[in-house]
C-alpha cells in the first residue's frame, strides 16, 4: 500500500463487514453430484498456486467426502513470494532475503468478490484498510465469515534453516531443502467447510512495512475431485451395447506340472493375461443367479435338490435385512470406501431390526434395535464385511461422522440381497400346466428370507463344520462380486437415464432390467413365470438352458401322468379327433337312448290317462238322459195301510 495515502491501521479500525470470500474450484468428471450420497468418498486434491510465477506452493491429496475433506495446508511464505518480489529488491533468492522476510507481518485480502475501493490484482485486492480478512499482523486481521485463515507456524529463530541444504556445505547447522524458514499454515474455517466451491478463488497477500509500498503477491486455491465416476456419452443409446449372450462355461483344465527348461535355453517370460472385460447382460445376470445358488446350496442343501430361482422384472431389485454388527473407526477413509463401492441407489425394502446411526425419524425407528450415537470428531465408520450402510441418501460402505453431525442423514446397517425368489418345482410346473389352482397366491420365498442374518455374529450360523461363517466362504464372495457388478450396471443405467438427451423412445428403452430379462427369455435362457425370469437349479448347479429343461420336465410329468391312466382315458389322450367326435354326438345319442328306454312306459301311461278321462265323460253324458226315482220305505207303506 502507499504510505502517504492513508495511515497505518489500528486494531479498532478493522471493518468487520468485509466481502464474503468463496474459495476453491471443484473439478468434476462430467457427472452431476446433486443426487450423490453425502458419504461418498472421493480423491480430493487441494492446490495452492503462486499466480506471479505459476509454481505450485502446495498440493495435498486425501480420500474424503465433500463435507470433511478440508485438511490443513502447509507451505512456505517464499513459495508465494518467489525469488524477486516487485521492484523493491525483496525476495527469497538469498538466505538473507529469506531471513528478512521473517521480520515482516503480512495480511491477506480476497479477490473473488471485491468490494468497492479494494482495488484489483495490482493492489492485491487490498486497496484500503478493512479489505483484509486474515494474516499475521499486530492488529490480528480476522473475520467471522471468512473461509480460510492463513497464519505463521513456529518460525525458527536461527538463520540456519534459511540456507538451502542442497546448495551449501554440510557445516551450516539446520540448513533445510530450499531454505524454508517461513512456514505457514492454511486452515479452513467452519464457514469455509460449508461453502459452495464453484470456481477458482484468488487472494492477494501483502507484506506490512512501516514505510514505503507494501509489496504484493497473489495466490489461488483450487480443489480437484477425481474418480467421481465414468463419463456418460451424449448420443445413441448406450444400454443395448452390452447385451451380449452368456459365454459358454469354461472347462477347468488341471494344471500341468512345470517342465524344466532344456539346458542352454533362454528363460521365457510368461505372457500377461489380457485385462478382464466387463460381463455382458447374460453373464452378469447368470452370475447373480449362480451366486445366489452357491450361497443357498452351502447353507441349505435340502432346498437345492431341485428348485427354480427367479429374477424379478420390476423394482425393487434388491432388499436389505437390518442386522447388528461391530463397525470399525478410521481417522482417514479406508481403501474399501472408494468411489467404486459407492452407490446412489435407494434401498426401498428393508426388514428386521439392526444397528442405526444418525437422526432416525419416527417413521423408521422400527428398523432400529440399537441407535448408536457418534462421538465428537471427524472419522469414518466402516461397515463390517458382508454388510453395507443403507442411508436415506443411498448405499455406502463408510459413513462420515462430519456429514452425520452437519445433516439429518441416518443409516441402518444391512445385508444386501438380490431380489431372487425361490420356487418349488411343483409350483412352477403347475403354473405352466395350468392344472393346479390356488385359492390364494403362495407366499414367495426370497433370498433375503432364506439367508438373511447369516453373515453377522449371534445369528451367524456356522457352515460346514460349524466354525466357518458364511461371510468367509468363497460362495459368499462370489455372490458379493456379482451383486457389486449388477449394482454398477443398474447405477450406470440410472445415470444414463438422467443424462439422456435423446428421444422419448430411447428413454423408454433404458428400462434396463426389463430389457435384460426379455433378452434372456427370448434366448431361451430362462422361463418366464408371470413377472419373473426363472432358472432351473439342482445339485449340479444352475442350468443355463432353462427353457429346454422346463420342456423336458413338463414332458416327463406328462408321461408319468399318462402312465397312471387307464386304457379308456389313454384313448382320449392319444386321439384328439376322437375326443372331439364323441363330445359332438354324445348329447344326441343320450337323448335318443332315453327316448327308447322311457318312451313306451310314458306312452302307456298317457294312453291310460286319456281312456280314464274319456270313460268319465261318457258316464256324465248318459246320466243326463234319466231322472232318479224317489225311493219308498216298505215299513212306511205298511203303516199307512
Curated annotation (Swiss-Prot):
Provide the residues annotated with a glycan attachment (glycosylation).
Answer: 43, 58, 297, 336, 369
Which CDD domains would you find in this protein's record? HTLV-1-like_HR1-HR2
Q: Which GO terms describe its molecular function?
A: metal ion binding
Residues spanned by motif CXXC = 307-310
- Mapped to this chain, the residue ranges on the Cytoplasmic side of the membrane are 603-641
What are the TM regions of this chain, as residue ranges?
582-602
Task: Please indicate the ranges of residues that lie on the Extracellular side.
Answer: 33-581
Signal sequence span is 1-32
Q: Where is the lipid attached (S-palmitoyl cysteine)?
A: 601
- Gene3D superfamilies, sorted: 1.10.287.210, ENV polyprotein, receptor-binding domain
| Short motif (YXXL motif): ranges | 626-629
Q: What is this protein called?
A: MLV-related proviral Env polyprotein
